[in-house]
Amino acid sequence: VDNPMFVSRNNGGGMRWTAEYPRFTAFGTSFAKGFGSQTVRGEVAYKPRFPVQGSFGFHRADLWQGVLGWDYDIDSKYYLNFQLFGDVQEGSEASGSRTWHGATYEISGKWFRDALKTGVRGKLYTSGEGTLTEVFLEYELDDHWKASTGVMFWTGGEDTILGEYTDNDFVYLTLRYAF
């Protein structure tokens, strides 16, 4: 996880928020099995004493994460992806035990000799944490340049994982150069 934890510190002149990257340990395993044009895969991870953001810093909780996914490629032109996920946070000091679960999906297609990819992808929390839907278009101009555009819609209550972004629906345009 590359996201910092924000910690409130008294530096003598008042409170100051600083970003910290606390260390953590993770154990996990994954599998994948292909069946012709489809793949079934799964992952499970255990993160003991994982850092969890709190009101004035971070605290620690054991975190279990699991994913079970299915990919289907139709003639190398159309792509379907569906995943079920779940996270269980056990007994943190501030928030207690929590459980999140849901599904992610992508439906896309390629055209113009695979240079253009269009589709829709998203995330739905069945535990009531909101939804994210993205409609996108990606175009590979050549081996170095790639352009993409899309729109993202967020839903959910203000106090939910995705709902806190509800007022942040946005349109994007990206141009990338790889060398």
Q: Predicted regions span which residues?
A:
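Outer-membrane beta-barrel proteins
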Residues: 2-7, 40, 51-55, 89-94, ...
